[in-house]
Amino acid sequence: MKVIFVASGNKAVGTVSAFVRSQYESLQREGVDMTLFPVCGHGWKAYAKAWVRLRRLVRAQHPDIVHAHYSVCGVLAAAATCCNRTKVMVSILGSFPRPSFKLRWVRFFIRHVWDATIVKSQRTADQLGIDLPVIANGVNLDQFALVDYHTARQRCGFEEGKKYVIWCSHPSRSEKRYPLAQKAVALLDDPNVVLYPVYDKPHSEVVEYMCAADVLLLTSVCEGSPNVIKEAMACNCPVVTTDVGDVTWVTGGLAGTWVVPYGDADALQQAIRNALLFGKRTQGRERILTLGLTTQQVAQKIKAIYDTL
């Protein structure tokens, strides 16, 4: 089976998101003949150029499936394969918190254009109003291996006597709501609690921070299935998160995890306070295994859909 993997390459020239790369590699390990196609640049000109390149690649390789990540890449994949029999599968990675034009056209493509569509959370499927397979992104447990808490703190340069709340994204990304994280931590009024943003780090270093942190905080306004929550759980790190995507299902009421309404800084600070009082590691890694959210378990689910097309 030949599959072309299409995804945004705007992280850097020719570089896709870490979770896309991880899924690509896990499908290769399942025996799928994979080709990665990054879409570089922004705007219609970039996608027009990508359409020419993708169409040429499809004609040269004759793949069985073009699997696109994100709805816009799904439109690109459909346009590039419209004159042949290649199947198009799309992973919808975000969510639709309110009715919009985008919601309407995504529904149209799911029903009339794409051959298969998967979403990352049941919430997204409910927002679309369509019965769709829900397959969240997985975590590579070999990559996110456990590191001793005290060893990790030393490697990260964390100060003795301080509690660290890590927040894993670039503060400039408005949808991630870093100011809300700042406000919640400020409400604790404790100089020994440090809000520590982690960004532009390789996975090998992110693992260290998650194993060293006292709490992982997520304050996004919307997500599909945030990988950072699953990665933190794989490191047995306590989690405080806004109620986005599938976090309620993933955390499942596990001791050491708190899900609070979006935008409520008081509720966030209380949850952070509770997490710090919890004061130990969670059983998050065990729950990831139970839910079937390792990269290989997820790859097997995706391959099963490939086999039906």
PLM regions and their residue ranges:
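Acidic anion/phosphate-binding donor-loop and adjacent secondary structure
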Residues: 139-155, 309
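A charged, aromatic-enriched C-terminal amphipathic alpha-helix characteristic of glycosyltransferases
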Residues: 279-308
